[in-house]
Amino acid sequence: MRQFIVIGHDVPTDPDAVSLADLPGAGRLDVLCRCLNSAFFLSHDLRDNVRVWLVVGDEYAIRFEGSELRRLNPDERSTAALVRGALAAREKAIGSMAANPSPGVYIRTQSLSGLLESVADDGPLVTLHEDGQPVVDIDPSAEPTFVLSDHHSFDDAETALLAAHADRRVSLGPEPLHADHAITVAHNYLDTDGYNRY
């Protein structure tokens, strides 16, 4: 299973602070919605072998399971409604037990540190960063967990956590990419067996 962990630095944890009419004003929730859409959507289908984690406020981890998703649509507004619905269910997430407010959407109380520890055995943990090694150094047959940031760079604490937990720091090309575009390029690399099969 391919996994993507996206850190949302400014997204509010209070669902009442998330206006579907102003996604950029909701801590740039629009960026996270584009990441979700890039992770799951194909031309006429959804990727069912993908899991996306949104880390919100370093307090909640919202998980989207491709094999279970039923209400994900390609527009940012309806995607944001799923995120807001997850945040509205946050108080039902007790300890490490997740709440499940919608098919394929789960929320639990968990920091980035705890999430990195919980996915450590799932496959190689790869930080996507413009200063990393070229992506071609990653074995495309592996099922990596990619970690990337929203419109902000990783802060010092996140950088230290990733240095301690990640197996690699990888760049997807010579130019910095938006997070949602980086997800598309990472998918393409894995889909083509390292750019060898089209």
Swiss-Prot record:
Gene Ontology cellular-component annotations: cytoplasm
InterPro entries with a match to the protein in the record: Alpha/beta_knot_MTases, TrmY, tRNA_m1G_MTases_N
Locations listed in the record: Cytoplasm
Its EC number(s): 2.1.1.257
Residues bound to S-adenosyl-L-methionine: L128
Top-rank taxon, per record: Archaea
Single GO MF annotation: S-adenosylmethionine-dependent methyltransferase activity
GO biological process: tRNA methylation
Reactions catalysed: pseudouridine(54) in tRNA + S-adenosyl-L-methionine = N(1)-methylpseudouridine(54) in tRNA + S-adenosyl-L-homocysteine + H(+)
Keyword S-adenosyl-L-methionine attributed: yes
Annotated keywords: Cytoplasm, Methyltransferase, S-adenosyl-L-methionine, Transferase, tRNA processing
Catalytic class of the enzyme: transferase
One of the Pfam families matching this protein, by short name: Methyltrn_RNA_2
Family as reported in the entry's similarity comment: Belongs to the methyltransferase superfamily. TrmY family.
Function per UniProt: Specifically catalyzes the N1-methylation of pseudouridine at position 54 (Psi54) in tRNAs.
Subunit-level organization: Homodimer.
PANTHER family recorded: TRNA (PSEUDOURIDINE(54)-N(1))-METHYLTRANSFERASE
Protein name listed in UniProt: tRNA (pseudouridine(54)-N(1))-methyltransferase
Provenance organism: Natronomonas pharaonis (strain ATCC 35678 / DSM 2160 / CIP 103997 / JCM 8858 / NBRC 14720 / NCIMB 2260 / Gabara)
Lineage of producing organism: Archaea, Methanobacteriati, Methanobacteriota, Stenosarchaea group, Halobacteria
